[in-house]
Amino acid sequence: MNLSLVLAAFCLGIASAVPKFDQNLDTKWYQWKATHRRLYGANEEGWRRAVWEKNMKMIELHNGEYSQGKHGFTMAMNAFGDMTNEEFRQMMGCFRNQKFRKGKVFREPLFLDLPKSVDWRKKGYVTPVKNQKQCGSCWAFSATGALEGQMFRKTGKLVSLSEQNLVDCSRPQGNQGCNGGFMARAFQYVKENGGLDSEESYPYVAVDEICKYRPENSVANDTGFTVVAPGKEKALMKAVATVGPISVAMDAGHSSFQFYKSGIYFEPDCSSKNLDHGVLVVGYGFEGANSNNSKYWLVKNSWGPEWGSNGYVKIAKDKNNHCGIATAASYPNV
């Protein structure tokens, strides 16, 4: 065979193996890499660009359908842009749901005239949005958020609490640090330990380390925890209205949640049982003039303020326990 033909065929094979990218997205790709400080090796660059581009086009398709009234929320590119959904689920899946019988049961107030909307941020109960980064510690952020609120309720002082303290020190209670945990076990740790350090004295580093709890830096305590009736949104609503921010878990493993930006989140494939992410309900409300329509739970996430709506998400409310928002709700007793 003619050597030149062999070489031509070989080069054609190499060229066909190189991913074809949308050149119209080049500027956005370079801007995204600069914003999120991504540096790839030669072999990884093409793969990550392909994943990012697929995600970008999915987002654009969704937002086009949103403008046609097919969805109630928008999506946007963010720090998870170069991750497949499977990679995202593996990295961010941090909630380990377990039966834990040491808690009290929330006694629903009878004949309570509940407000149409609640936002504990406006009352000073909620610290700024934090970022768990690559560590599977969502459970710790959910737990500190609830405890911060209850300590404010008791003392009138809002102090940011140490998630790293929980990550490093609550393994005896059954938590697994950056490999996941359970908010109720975090509350149990605080009770058994006799306190929890402040974020300032025990800062977050997003990796598992040895326990460095110092009693003299403790700024919070609890006497155990209370669980809200599983799956009952009305009970959760009463707890949020009368107690304060509540720790909950949800199914957050979908691409639609990975790139959520604004609006009321509703995912048809969301599970009310298979929960993988701990978050904090800080209120509830509705959009529009009619309080019976477009109801939502106001949820604080732990993926930084750049994700979602300044770090928050509105989850569809009274939609059959959507995404399991009321399946595993609890709060510390202070």
UniProtKB/Swiss-Prot annotation:
Any one of the GO CC terms: extracellular region
Position of the signal peptide: 1-17
Keywords: Disulfide bond, Glycoprotein, Hydrolase, Lysosome, Protease, Signal, Thiol protease, Zymogen
KW Protease (keyword) present: yes
Cysteine-cysteine disulfides: 135-178, 169-211, 270-323
Keyword Disulfide bond: yes
SMART domains: Inhibitor_I29 (SM00848), Pept_C1 (SM00645)
Catalytic EC class: hydrolase
Residues of the active site: 138, 277, 301
PANTHER family named among the record's database cross-references: CYSTEINE PROTEASE FAMILY C1-RELATED
The protein, known as: Cathepsin L2
Organism field: Homo sapiens
Gene: CTSV
